């Protein structure tokens, strides 16, 4: 598996008395550097949370007119100079959904919250600002919890969860089509029970995790995602968390965060693992 690119993770804070009790997605904010977006698993309202790097709640945003069936992942994309968030309603435990859904919203920008954590801002993303796509797997329904957007190839990738060897699926977004978009199988990966993934801001590094391990790839220049992930991964230091389903690169690529659920009375920590190569993203 090779040497470790990241050091051991340390706790940066605890989600104390927080409505985030089943964190199931994490991504670094581009509009608000030093902050992270997350959301709950199925059963919650249609909302996303902004936390700082000490796990303190800063803002809650509701998505008007959107159903939260089984939100599992959140990702980032930039188009025409605008930062967007992609919310993945991609969970399907029984693999019965004929299609899954993603919602794309302009990333909210804040200024007043930086100096105060007295109370979280609460606001709403209007329905007119939400772009929704329905997606369909080319080979039938799948359960998935891992999703990221590749800025180099302008592709959204979803990694399935429950197979003994999971699938990597891709689709180009954004698109103007109102039809259900086809998720094409790009590769089969020798992992199982994948719960989260992220890509570095420049698209050169990829992280994938399950409940026990974090895996890392360094992408070669011009390489497709399927070729990158078909190479052997390097396994990173990781202390398993209670139902750990969230991972995100820091905005400068200098490490990654993980966030877990509050499970069986255990606290949910925000962990940070530093990159052994300082500031690798140029």
Short names for language-model regions:
Residues 2-282:
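Sequence/structural signature of beta-propeller domains
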């Amino acid at each position: 598996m090779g040497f470790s690119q990241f050091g051991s993770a340390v706790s940066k804070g605890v989600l104390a008395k927080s409505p985030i009790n089943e964190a199931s997605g994490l991504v670094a904010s581009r509009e608000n550097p030093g902050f992270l977006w997350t959301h709950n698993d199925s059963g919650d309202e249609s909302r996303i949370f902004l936390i700082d790097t000490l796990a303190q709640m800063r803002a809650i945003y509701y998505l008007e007119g959107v159903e939260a069936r089984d939100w599992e992942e959140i990702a980032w994309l930039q188009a025409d100079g605008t930062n967007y968030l992609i919310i993945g309603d991609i969970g399907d435990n029984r693999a019965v959904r004929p299609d899954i859904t993603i919602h794309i919203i302009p990333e909210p920008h804040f200024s007043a919250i930086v100096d105060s954590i007295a109370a979280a801002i609460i606001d709403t993303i209007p329905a007119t600002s939400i772009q929704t796509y329905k997606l369909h797997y080319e080979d039938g329904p799948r359960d998935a919890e891992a999703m990221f957007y590749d800025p180099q190839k302008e592709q959204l990738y979803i990694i399935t969860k429950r197979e003994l060897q999971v699938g990597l699926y891709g689709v180009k977004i954004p698109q103007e089509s109102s039809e259900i978009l086809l998720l094409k199988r790009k590769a089969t990966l020798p992992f199982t029970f994948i719960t989260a993934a992220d890509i570095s801001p420049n698209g050169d590094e990829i992280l994938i995790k399950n409940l026990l391990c974090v895996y890392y790839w360094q992408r070669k220049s011009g390489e497709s995602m399927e070729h990158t992930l078909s190479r052997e991964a390097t396994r990173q230091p990781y202390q398993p968390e209670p139902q750990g389903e969230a991972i995100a690169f820091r905005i400068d690529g200098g490490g990654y965060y993980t966030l877990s659920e509050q499970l069986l009375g255990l606290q949910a920590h925000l962990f940070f693992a530093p990159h052994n190569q300082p500031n690798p993203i140029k």
